[in-house]
Swiss-Prot record:
This is KAT8 regulatory NSL complex subunit 1-like protein. PANTHER family: KAT8 REGULATORY NSL COMPLEX SUBUNIT 1-LIKE PROTEIN, NON-SPECIFIC LETHAL 1, ISOFORM M. Pfam families: PEHE. InterPro entries: NSL1, PEHE_dom. Residues 748-862 form the PEHE domain.
Length: 903
């Protein structure tokens, strides 16, 4: 079984040979010679017994020594002639016929001249060019040689076959047109014969159709056989190419053996011939690298590289297991079935993958939608919980026959009657002389009256009546509840609430009189005119008890409540302070947070403000209360009295408690801020009013407590005013924009410069004495200089202090520049005071006087020195201190002269 060849359609001139092919299976019945000339290549057909070996070697030697004919890749224009033997002819059916035998003999003796522009095989003859697409690996002439396989020749098959007396003379496959054409022609005599035998036209058409189908089937069989023959031909051509390479190499080796001395090829050249092409080509190239000329060497190298690549590709592509190719007649059907199965499986996998991905996407979308639905449901439930629920009374069945059920005014005012009322704040009962018939318009007025009664109830729950001093303790302990909120925003002794209640009663009387005289329309049962039975607003945010407790503690401890409200007793009852500050909405929100834990200062809406807090702020607005002039004058007088009392008491206590030193530099600044604090305290205490006649003692205690707290606040502010914190300074951008930013100029610190000293080699002394490294010697050596440096530093530090502290740090009569201190007093143990020091006048060197108790001196510019000190300045300094000089002389007597440098 001959392995088939898988071909691919190349982009340019060239062909690709497939699977492995053993070199031992190659036969030499055909010799393929390559030439670069324009003439037709000559391929000699070997005889039955084959040519002589000498002739072969001579021919190969002649061809191989031609440098341009081996491995040439420059020329693309050449012609190739294939002389096919009998085993490569097309095996067509009906081999026993005379026509087939003649054609077979003609094919065996015919030379096919194939040029580069020759037409290719028809589409039906090409071997599945779409199955594989491999990159082109063949170089030059070999690629062109193998590329002409699929461009062989126009196949003309002529066959005559008689079927039921009808002759189909010709079945033409024309490769020039690239299409399959079937020419069915019949002789007139045959047609007349058929028409004579066939009785009807329908039978003639049926017979013609059957014959046409048979012809097409036969044509398909022929095409399949042609494909198989083409694959066999390709395999033979691959064998010829491999054999050609072997012959070229053998001829070259024999040529080198005959022409060169035998010493060069001591490494068994026959082994090189029998080995694989890779080893042979590498051995040849390494063995002949020194003997060949440059041109021949490059040609051999190119030839070896091309042959190596071609054989690698042949060995790779001719593997029947990898390619699935076979020369069996059923190979096409099996390959088609396998390809169909592979395609079906691939399509099924792709569809399954697509469906799976789509299913996953749908699942994710469904889960996302479910999450959104759940989120919207929760949000809807929260909105419904937060939304107030309105309950209206049931409308009457007959608007004009049956009266609506209305709660009695006494029932609505029962809660207000239970609360203690002022004698002037009595609420008169509604008029009883009005007509109560259903057609009367007074029912609408009664509804208005009941709504006003409810407002009266709310206001009465917020007001504090004037009680006796005996009842004041009970009222202070009692905590009222209004609208579900604890009322802790008021105390008992506020006269403006009673005045406000009296004015509201008068207004209700006026409105009632006007409404009784006005004409009303008939009563209807719409929701707009139906009485409101209940209103309940749920809070969306509910805070825990721990947060409310912490919030209350923070509110009382925060600086906001230091001026608005302060706790007066253990029950956290507080008093309104400043009316101007209470009108701010954020303060109302803070008070609402204190009164009700459900109210949040940020998250809650303004309309969720507790009603008692909102109504408690209304009486403090003087421009909203339009009362009698007498009441306002009296109230203003009481306010003036309380304000004067508070300001006087606070000012006396403040002056007695704090009296700054008049000699301090910040005296004027503190006095200015004290006047400002007094004005602020007077403004804060302006809102505090207490009834002088009823609760004078409690008012005095409260004023004393408030004044003490104000004094403490003023002290803290004055104490913090002396310290400047850069982080707490706030400058408006309007002041910064037109100004230019100035950079701080830092003064450079003058450091002593270093002097380069030429190092001289020290002569080793005759008698080396050990140096005294004890602590006492070190201290005695350096104590004097340390004291001098301390004196200099302290005087420099005093001179660099700010200007505002110079008057306090120095005395009035002396200046820091006029003080001269001597180092002798600071160094000698007999010096007790600065006055006992005597300045020394030696050598123009200015000495310093230093005292640890009163460092008020200023240094005069001293001489610049270079450290370490040399011998002369050291001796000069030692001479200025007698005691140290004596010690140094004693040391110098004990040690050599060179040891003095260490001092």
């Amino acid at each position: 079984m001959t392995p088939a060849l898988t071909e691919t359609v190349p982009q340019g001139p060239g062909a690709h040979l497939a699977p492995s092919f053993a070199l031992q299976s190659l036969n030499s019945d055909t010799i393929i010679c390559m030439d670069n000339s324009q003439a037709v290549e000559h391929i000699s057909l070997p005889k039955a017994n084959g040519p002589k070996v000498a002739d072969k070697k001579q021919l190969l030697k002649t061809e191989f020594m031609n440098g341009n004919s081996i491995g040439s890749q420059t020329s693309g224009h050449y012609q190739t002639v294939f002389l096919l033997t009998s085993n490569t002819a097309l095996s067509l059916p009906n081999k026993g016929s005379s026509t087939w035998k003649m054609e077979n003999q003609d094919v065996c003796k015919q030379r096919f001249h194939i040029t580069k522009g020759s037409p290719s095989l028809p589409n039906g003859m090409s071997y599945q060019p779409e199955r594989k697409a491999k990159r082109e690996l063949f170089p030059g002439c070999v690629s062109q040689l193998l590329a002409d396989v699929h461009k062989l020749w126009d196949v003309s098959l002529t066959k005559t076959q008689g079927t039921e007396g009808i002759c189909l003379p010709e079945c033409m496959l024309n490769g020039h047109r690239g299409t399959e054409s079937l020419a069915v022609s019949s002789c007139p005599s045959l047609i007349s014969h058929v028409s004579a035998n066939v009785p009807s036209v329908a039978s003639v058409k049926a017979v013609g159709t059957n014959l046409l189908l048979k012809c097409l089937n036969h044509q398909q069989v022929l095409l399949n056989r042609a494909r198989r023959n083409q694959k066999r031909l390709q395999s033979y051509l691959a064998q010829h190419a491999v054999q050609h390479f072997n012959q070229q190499i053998r001829a070259f080796v024999n040529h080198q053996i005959h022409d060169k001395p035998a010493g060069i090829f001591d490494s068994q050249p026959t082994k090189v011939i029998n080995n694989n092409l890779n080893v042979g080509s590498s051995g040849i190239s390494s063995a002949t690298s020194d003997g060949l000329k440059n041109g021949v060497y490059h040609s051999v190298k190119r030839f070896s590289v091309s042959a190596k690549e071609i054989l690698k590709q042949i060995k790779k592509d001719f593997d029947s297991d990898a390619t699935g190719s076979s020369s069996d007649e059923d190979w096409d059907e099996k390959a088609r079935q396998n390809s169909d199965e592979c395609n079906a499986e691939r399509s099924w996998l792709s569809v399954r993958t697509r469906i799976g991905s789509r299913w996953v996407w749908l699942q994710s979308q469904i889960s996302e939608l479910e999450y959104k639905i759940q989120h919207l449901t929760d949000l809807h439930s929260q909105i419904r919980k937060a939304k107030g629920t309105l309950k209206f009374e049931e409308p009457s069945k007959g608007n004009f026959k049956q009266k609506l059920w209305l709660p009695d005014s006494e029932m609505l005012l029962s809660l207000a009657e239970r609360m203690p009322k002022s004698p002037q704040g009595t609420n008169p009962s509604p008029t009883n002389d009005l007509d109560m018939s259903p057609s009367s318009p007074t029912l609408l007025l009664r509804n208005i009256e009941k709504q006003s009664a409810r407002l009266t109830e709310i206001v009465s729950s917020l007001t504090v009546p004037l009680l006796s001093p005996n009842d004041s303790a009970k009222s202070s302990v009692y905590k009222r509840v209004a609208n579900g909120f604890s009322d802790r925003m008021h105390t008992d002794g506020f006269p403006s609430f009673n005045e406000f209640c009296e004015q509201q009663v008068k207004r209700r009387k006026k409105v009632r009189v006007k409404a009784s005289s006005a004409l009303g329309s008939n009563l209807c049962s719409s929701a707009r005119t139906r009485p409101l039975q209940a209103l309940k607003k749920r809070k969306l945010y509910k805070l825990s008890a721990e947060y409310s407790y912490v919030n209350k503690v923070n509110l009382f401890s925060s600086p906001v409540y230091q001026y608005e409200e302060l706790p007066s007793n253990g029950n956290h009852c507080s008093t309104w302070k400043c009316s101007k500050v209470l009108h701010r909405p954020w303060l109302m929100a803070q008070n609402a947070c204190e009164a009700d834990s459900c109210f949040h200062p940020v998250l809650s809406f303004p309309y969720e403000l507790p009603l008692n807090v909102h109504l408690a702020a209304l009486p403090m607005k003087n421009h909203n209360i339009k009362g009698n002039s007498v009441d306002s004058i009296a109230l203003r007088g009481e306010l003036d009295k309380s304000q004067s009392y508070v300001s006087a008491s606070w000012s006396t206590e403040c002056t007695s408690s704090y009296s700054p030193d008049p000699q301090t530099p910040a005296h004027s600044w503190e006095r200015r801020h004290r006047s400002e604090s007094e004005a602020d305290a007077a403004l804060l205490e302006s809102g505090l009013t207490t009834p002088v006649s009823t609760q004078k003692s409690s008012a005095q205690q409260l004023l004393a407590h408030e004044s003490s707290s104000m004094v403490c606040a003023a002290r803290r502010r004055l104490r913090s005013g002396n310290s400047y914190d850069i982080n707490n300074i706030v400058i408006p951008m309007s002041l910064i924009a037109p100004t230019k930013l100035e950079k701080l100029k830092y003064k450079e610190i003058i450091t002593p410069s270093w002097k380069e000293v030429v190092l001289e080699p020290l002569e080793s002394p005759a008698h080396d004495m050990p140096e005294d490294l004890s602590d006492e010697a070190y201290i005695s050596r350096h104590e004097k200089y340390e004291l001098k440096e301390k004196a200099r530093w302290s005087l420099w530090d005093h001179s660099k202090r700010p200007k505002r502290n110079r008057s306090s740090s120095y005395s009035f009569g002396t200046s820091p520049r006029t003080v001269l201190l001597s180092c002798e007093c600071s160094c000698s143990p007999n010096s007790q005071a600065p006055s006992e020091a005597l300045p020394s006048d030696t050598g123009g060197y200015r000495t310093l006087h230093f005292s640890h108790e009163s460092p008020k001196g200023k240094t005069i510019h001293w001489e610049r020195r270079v450290f370490p000190l040399t011998e002369e300045p050291a001796m000069e300094l030692l001479g200025k201190c007698p005691s140290q000089a004596q010690v140094s002389t004693v040391d110098n007597q004990q040690c050599p002269k060179n040891d003095c440098d260490y001092t």
